[in-house]
Amino acid sequence: MDNNIRQLIGANQVAEILGISSSYAYKIIEELNQELEKAGYLTIRGKVDSLYLERRYFPTPDKIYTVNN
């Protein structure tokens, strides 16, 4: 995933990025979209913002450090 490009991605891309099945990817997309809707954002069913997915599933090294210490 390119860190500088924001795009909406579907279940097949989410599945590939996370190494999961596409059916499980749909569940993850639904959960992430519910979080975004709760925060007041509009969402598209079956798509999720790539940067939001990255932020939720791939923490930065400084966040990993603070959790481990």
Model regions and ranges:
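Short hydrophobic "helix-edge" motifs at membrane interfaces and signal-peptide entry regions
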Residues: 1-2, 40
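Major-groove DNA-recognition helix of helix-turn-helix-type DNA-binding domains
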Residues: 20-65
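Polyanion-binding surface elements
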Residues: 2-24
